[in-house]
A protein has these predicted regions:
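HIT superfamily nucleotide-processing domains
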Residues: 1-177
Length: 177
């Protein structure tokens, strides 16, 4: 059985910088974003008292989102029951919205705990939701260290906000947008 390799050429430089400093690069990204009103400039799509939903500034694919707890905590074991339930609900909500808007063939949904596991933002739990399509990889990241995205982050933001509004009825709540 052969093994496929997923390679993000820009990632190693980022990890080495963080590793050399032995800490997160600057203040906690998610704590800073959690204090901001949702908006296109900061990529925050929605927030609740417990959860933050935002686009990834360095997406692996169009629609790549992150769901984070608003409370700074490094471990799944530290989550309250309410936080764990709301994060799970938001993962489902984002999956439904991205499916409605982009019709992907699948998703990578996951979390990296700790620097050695690939976490770029240490100490603050966050989940990645990455839509996937058949044939969504090509030679550009390998040969040119470049990821090709079919639309701008601004356009992705608009589409995701609209799709989340459309699925809100199903989930019975509305986040601040």
């Amino acid at each position: 059985m052969s093994v496929d390799v997923l390679w993000a050429g820009w990632r190693m430089g980022y990890i080495k910088k963080a590793s050399a400093k032995g800490r997160v690069l600057g203040p906690c990204l998610f704590c800073a974003k959690a204090r901001l009103k949702p908006g296109k400039r900061n990529l925050v799509v929605a927030r609740t008292p417990r959860v933050l939903a935002m686009l990834n500034l360095y997406p692996y694919n169009v629609g790549h989102m992150m769901i984070a707890t608003r409370r700074h905590t490094p471990s799944l074991a530290d989550l309250t029951r309410d936080e764990a339930l709301e994060v799970t609900e938001w993962l489902g909500r984002v999956e439904a919205a991205l499916t409605r808007e982009y019709e992907p063939h699948g998703f990578n949904i996951g979390i990296n705990l700790g620097r050695v596991a690939g976490a770029g933002v240490l100490g603050h739990l966050h989940w990645h939701v990455v839509p996937r399509w058949d044939g969504d990889t090509n030679f550009m990241p390998v040969t040119a260290n470049t990821k090709v995205l079919p639309e701008s982050l601004d356009r992705t933001y608009e589409r995701v906000v609209g799709a989340l509004a459309a699925v809100d009825r199903r989930f019975g709540t509305r986040a601040r947008r």
